[in-house]
């Protein structure tokens, strides 16, 4: 693993440690410029050595997989270093924020088609999203008019983050690369051919507000609105399929639907505004990756999804400028 900031310590490493205890993986190296941080992590993993440089770690440990959890502007070089050595990659989002970044991703994937270039897209493992997805994908397949509305509100950037990259929209992606990209990834799962048709962004770094409009299927539309200028932490997803008289709402820890005018009882569900819930989703993400990394078809699909989502994000950022 390269990068031992908040994402690594709160989510990646606990999930990897559980997999290590279960015997399905061994953490063989950790890399970070902070000596105390890397040594402390290495001490908790029986087979791990600590390194200050990624190239040195890759050469010394010859891993099967490199997990990248550094700031976004470092991702492409670290991915390239791994792929050139025949190492699969799992990289934190975002993988790129420009059309040039996407072109380089395509080039890397094209030169190493046997390797996985996967992204951390753990939201798809949330059970409430799987319920929304089953309802929404029918609209895509049927070519129905339908809408998906997403709202994410935060009172500023993550105060637990080890760095300030989230407040740097020009170089690191800002709120589009931090929050909106999670939902672009979910929309891409609904329709791999979806397309960004509009994006607006305003406000200074760290207090941004952005909205992204995405076309889904023949007649579906989604809007993802994300704000760092909020007063609370909240996540909401709303699906409306008029042809089926179906409305689905997932707002924080509450899930409800209305079908043919009949409302269901509200169900208590995991909330994506709860950091503990988001962090816990890394475990099923890693279980899926570990179980399928030897499957060439899975690797190809993961890489295609990575590039598709990166292209959506790059299009949104380009339109917002």
Over which residues does each language-model region extend?
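N-terminal Rossmann-like dinucleotide-binding module
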Residues: 1-45
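Active-site loop of classical SDR/Rossmann-like NAD(P)-dependent oxidoreductases
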Residues: 7, 33-36, 273-287
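Beta-loop-alpha module in the N-terminal Rossmann-like domain of NAD(P)-dependent dehydrogenases
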Residues: 45-108
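C-terminal helix-rich "cap/oligomerization" subdomain common to oxidoreductases
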Residues: 65-67, 217, 288-321
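Hydrophobic residues in well-ordered beta-strands that form the structural core
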Residues: 91, 117-119, 248
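Rossmann-fold dehydrogenase core element
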Residues: 103-123, 144-150
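Predominantly a Rossmann-like dinucleotide-binding segment in NAD(P)-dependent oxidoreductases
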Residues: 123-197
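Contiguous beta-strand/loop segments that form the cofactor/metal-binding neighborhood of enzyme cores
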Residues: 178, 184-254, 283-295
């Amino acid at each position: 693993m390269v990068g031992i900031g908040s994402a690594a310590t709160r989510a990646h490493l606990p999930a990897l440690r559980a997999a290590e205890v279960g015997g399905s993986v061994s953490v063989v190296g950790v890399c970070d410029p902070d000596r105390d941080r890397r040594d402390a992590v290495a001490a908790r993993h029986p087979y791990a050595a600590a390194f200050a440089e990624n190239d040195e770690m890759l050469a010394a440990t010859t891993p099967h997989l490199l997990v990248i959890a550094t700031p976004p502007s470092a991702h492409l070089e670290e991915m390239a270093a791994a792929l050139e050595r025949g190492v699969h990659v799992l990289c934190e989002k975002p993988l790129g924020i420009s059309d040039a970044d996407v072109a380089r991703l395509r080039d890397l994937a094209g030169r190493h088609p046997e390797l996985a270039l996967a992204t951390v897209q753990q939201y798809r493992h949330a059970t409430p999203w799987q319920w929304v997805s089953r309802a929404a994908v029918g609209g895509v397949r049927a070519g129905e008019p339908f809408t998906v509305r997403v709202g994410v509100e935060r009172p500023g950037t993550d105060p637990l983050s080890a760095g300030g990259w989230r407040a740097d929209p020009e170089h690191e992606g800002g709120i589009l690369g931090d929050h909106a990209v999670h939902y672009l990834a979910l929309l891409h799962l609904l329709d791999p051919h979806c397309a960004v048709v509009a994006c607006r962004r305003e406000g200074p770094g760290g207090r941004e507000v952005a909205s992204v409009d995405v076309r889904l299927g023949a007649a579906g539309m989604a809007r993802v609105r994300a704000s760092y200028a909020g007063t609370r932490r909240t996540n909401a997803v709303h699906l409306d399929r008029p042809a089926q008289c179906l409305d689905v709402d997932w707002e924080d820890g509450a899930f409800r639907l209305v079908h043919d005018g009949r409302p269901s009882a509200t169900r208590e569900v995991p909330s994506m505004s709860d950091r503990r819930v988001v962090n816990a989703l890394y475990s099923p993400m890693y279980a899926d990756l570990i179980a399928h990394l030897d499957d060439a078809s899975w690797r190809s699909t993961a890489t295609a999804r990575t590039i598709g989502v990166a292209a959506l994000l790059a299009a949104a950022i380009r339109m917002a400028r």
